[in-house]
UniProtKB/Swiss-Prot annotation:
The UniProt record lists the keyword Flavoprotein: no
Designated name of the protein: Elongation factor P
A Gene Ontology cellular-component term: cytoplasm
Family to which the UniProt record says this protein belongs: Belongs to the elongation factor P family.
Alphabetical GO biological process terms: peptide biosynthetic process
One Pfam family recorded for the sequence: EFP_N
Superkingdom of the organism of origin: Bacteria
Function: Involved in peptide bond synthesis. Stimulates efficient translation and peptide-bond synthesis on native or reconstituted 70S ribosomes in vitro. Probably functions indirectly by altering the affinity of the ribosome for aminoacyl-tRNA, thus increasing their reactivity as acceptors for peptidyl transferase.
Annotated GO MF terms: translation elongation factor activity
Keyword line: Cytoplasm, Elongation factor, Protein biosynthesis
Organism this protein belongs to: Bradyrhizobium sp. (strain ORS 278)
Biochemical pathway: Protein biosynthesis; polypeptide chain elongation
Amino acid sequence: MKVIASSIRKGNVIEQDGKLYVVVSAENIHPGKGTPVSQIEMRRISDGVKISERYKTTDQVEKATIEERNYTYLYEDQDGFHFMNPETYDQVQVPKDVVGTQAAYLQENMTVKLSMHDTNPVSIALPQRVTLEVVETEPVTKGQTASSSYKPAVLSNGVRTGVPPHITVGTRIVVMTEDGSYCERAKD
């Protein structure tokens, strides 16, 4: 299906020159003079090569038909990440470059949305928030409760983030998967 370039967003799949590309980033640029353009960074699905394209915002781009389904994360091995369709129990192997940096937030039995073109996984969407445990952080300093500054912490998945001063080692916190930022203390 053809769409205008300015409507392309991160995660969309574009068909160009007979090959499929996943959009890594898309930005509409409106210079003071001249025609507005869409700067689109894409990753070729077949071999992972990244390219950058610039289109006029009114140019037509071929958007590939993608099917999104819920899958359950099972495990990781040297070949990639393995997911299961909870309805049919079919298993799908997703290459490591498709999962990318989101791999740190994958947890066993987590439900994720896999975008598939034919039978090929092209992108993955994790839940917006995950609950993790703080394994390393500085101790609470008395009198620091009034400041709004965050202190560094290492989470159970190895990711570093900033947490409020009252968070201690062993505390379970909710983290945003998009950027790894602290959201709140877990309520469990």
